[in-house]
Amino acid sequence: MSAVPHATPSPTTIACLLGPTASGKTAAALALAARRPIEIVSVDSALVYRDMDIGTAKPSRDERASVPHHLIDIIDPADAYSAASFRADTLRLIGEIAARGRTPLLAGGTMLYYKALTQGLNDLPGADPDVRATLDAEAERDGWPALHARLAQVDPDTAARLAPNDSQRIQRALEVFMLSGQPMSVLLAAPRRTDDAAAAYRFVPVALEPSDRAVLHKRIAQRFDAMLDAGFIDEVERLRRREDLHPDLPSMRCVGYRQAWEFLDGDTDYRTMRDKGIFATRQLCKRQITWLRAMPERIVVDCIAPDSTARALDALERVLDGRTPG
């Protein structure tokens, strides 16, 4: 008598609410929380930082009290948080939330994190404080354009897509080369490293996208002005008073913070700071939408429709109830 093979369990469906800045993700997530026992896992590289509340449009205390939120306020602005850390933390949290009999909802707009979660990681070396300190010292002496020129010699493909003053990415690309001996462009082109941890899940993205980008741009300007009115400049000033923060840290390169830092340094006036902050947010939005449109499996909801929250709620419930293809 032949043995009966064990059936492979079907992967658990995980609803993911993705969208650019100012697309209404928080409203849709809270609407779902009013209907189901969910816990929200943030997919946002800015919300991880403590003491950065206004400029990141962090959910309010009341909103966070109404439904559990995860991966918010988990590290200090002086520290770094990687896509690999996000992947490990999120997979752990999904299991813990399910064990409590609740439903995880992934929500955010950092598409690099989502890609790392669903497609695996590249074999890039981790950050090395000593290498970074060396590169910082060289940049202080020679300037970032000089380091960009050095990068062009060892990794011309990466250098070609970076501006000569893009300190964070130039530093990372040189760091990768110094630690691995290989150009970052070569490592990124290699097959991604995967494991079985994510194979137990089927991630279904519900994408909030604008049918008219001009409407979203208007929202972005209104939101940036609201942040300024709420005390954003004071928030950045408090961070500046710390002796361990500087504008090249990942935290201070978040949209808005870098522009506010330049203003407080006296490099720009208030109007220019506002305009540059809004422009940078619009550019971020453009990149986020480009990432979303590269996901053929996504369920699209028009985020500027009058009933966009209701539409997003319906899409999320269909995903959770298994009423979607795939």
Swiss-Prot record:
Q: What gene is this protein a product of?
A: miaA
The catalytic activity of this protein is classed by the Enzyme Commission as: 2.5.1.75
| Location of region: Interaction with substrate tRNA | 44-47, 168-172, 253-258, 286-293
Disulphide linkage map: none
UniProtKB keywords: ATP-binding, Magnesium, Nucleotide-binding, Transferase, tRNA processing
Q: Which Gene Ontology BP terms does the record give?
A: tRNA modification
Protein name stated in the entry: tRNA dimethylallyltransferase
Residues the record lists as binding ATP: 19-26
Write down the InterPro entries for this protein, in alphabetical order. Dimethylallyltransferase (IPR039657), IPT (IPR018022), P-loop_NTPase (IPR027417)
Tagged with keyword Nucleotidyltransferase: no
Catalysis: reaction(s):
adenosine(37) in tRNA + dimethylallyl diphosphate = N(6)-dimethylallyladenosine(37) in tRNA + diphosphate
